[in-house]
């Protein structure tokens, strides 16, 4: 009996260390720890590229045909960031905007659809930092998002980013 319990404990421990644990008890696909960490890093890379208005880094986190709501393809995504930077500069000149832009993603959960396809669910908000007490931080927008991410050549990328899903 003692050996059986030890064998079971070792088997369970090893199963948790497998690079891909395909199916959970309820039938839901599970990704590996490494995949989950890589996807969380992808989400961080996304918000940093958006916050710093780095159009090349922003487009690089998407698949070549990736989309942000209705904007599709890396060239269009780069243009979106360039236009955002121009708009922010104009609003700063008129005093309508102060402080840097910060995106926050919270309550993030990763649902694996297949070994190389996951869906990330989260709540988000965009805040512009304040300069001082007279210019406090300002929340620009908030909502819920749902992104489809896929593994391409060993790297997780955003295939579609939907920051206004129906439900």
Annotate the PLM regions.
Residues 117-121, 137-167:
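Short beta-strand edge/turn micro-motifs at domain boundaries
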Residues 1-10:
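Bacterial N-terminal signal peptides that target proteins for export
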Residues 9-19:
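Bacterial N-terminal signal peptides
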Residues 24-40, 133, 152-167:
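Terminal "cap-and-tail" regions of soluble proteins that handle hydrophobic small molecules
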Residues 127-139:
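Short, cysteine-centered beta-strand-loop-beta hairpins and adjacent loop/turn segments enriched
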Residues 37, 99-101, 138-140:
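Transmembrane beta-barrel outer-membrane domains
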Residues 20-52, 56-61, 75:
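Short, low-complexity N-terminal intrinsically disordered segments enriched in polar/charged residues
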């Amino acid at each position: 009996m003692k050996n059986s319990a030890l064998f079971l404990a070792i088997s369970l421990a090893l199963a948790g260390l497998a690079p891909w644990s395909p199916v959970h008890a309820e039938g839901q696909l599970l990704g590996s720890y490494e995949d989950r960490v890589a996807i969380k890093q992808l989400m961080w890379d996304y918000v940093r590229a958006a916050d710093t208005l780095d159009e090349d880094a922003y487009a690089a986190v998407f698949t070549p045909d990736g989309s942000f709501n209705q904007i599709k393809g890396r060239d269009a995504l780069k243009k979106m960031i360039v236009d955002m930077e121009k708009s922010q500069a104009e609003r700063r000149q008129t005093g309508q905007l102060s402080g840097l832009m910060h995106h926050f993603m919270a309550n993030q959960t990763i649902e694996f659809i297949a070994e190389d396809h996951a869906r990330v669910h989260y709540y988000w908000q965009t805040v512009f930092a304040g300069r001082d007490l007279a210019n406090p931080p300002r929340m620009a927008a908030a909502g819920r998002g749902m992104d489809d991410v896929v593994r391409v050549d060993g790297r997780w990328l955003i295939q579609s980013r939907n920051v206004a899903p129906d439900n």
